[in-house]
Amino acid sequence: MNTGQEADNEVIKLEDAYKIYPMGTEEVRALNGVNVTFKKGSFWAIMGQSGSGKSTMMNILGCLDRLTKGRYLLEGEDVSQLDDDSLSEFRLRHLGFIFQSFNLVPQLTVQRNIEMPLYYLGWDSAESAERSRELAINVGLGDRLDHKPTQLSGGQMQRVAIARALANNPQILLADEPTGNLDTATGEQIIEMLKELNRNGKTIIMVTHEPDIAENAKNILYMKDGVIERIE
């Protein structure tokens, strides 16, 4: 039985989690009864072949999709019971996202891209500007605030994406192939940034297909055919 302290330390918990997609007369079980707990301050890598369920799991963890059945507890809240609007707000307040393709808005400056989550949270412009400048400096882009994504290198764009993910000060960062579009040296720099964020208390869950990248995490979860094959 979990103690209260252990329960408080659980930031994400999937219980008997299924995600089933109809495929003609058949069904595909992208998640097939998954049970896993991610604790506060942990750093996880999720690995698996194409079709293993790792991307589906990240979509569920990011509140971008819903379970077919089972429970998803996020910071103690059963998000599987929330309506769409409540789920969107919960996602905005509790999660930060880092994508392989950066997902920056090309028409906006670095500063405006970083500010986007704050806009949706209703921050005023002065507070948003101060927060975005602080984050840009923290990721080494204080002199690039007025640049647009097309004027940046891949590594710089991923730094902007990390700053944007941190804008709402989430406790959990979800990183989907964060080094996938970067050269080796730049990828290592991004991983070092994630490790530093983890040392400062952020919980990080990262999907990667690169074993050498996964080895930077404290735990590695291997998916196969919609189930957890093993955890190292």
Q: Which ranges hold each PLM region?
A:
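ABC-family P-loop ATPase nucleotide-binding domain
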Residues: 1-20, 229-232
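ABC family nucleotide-binding domain
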Residues: 10-223
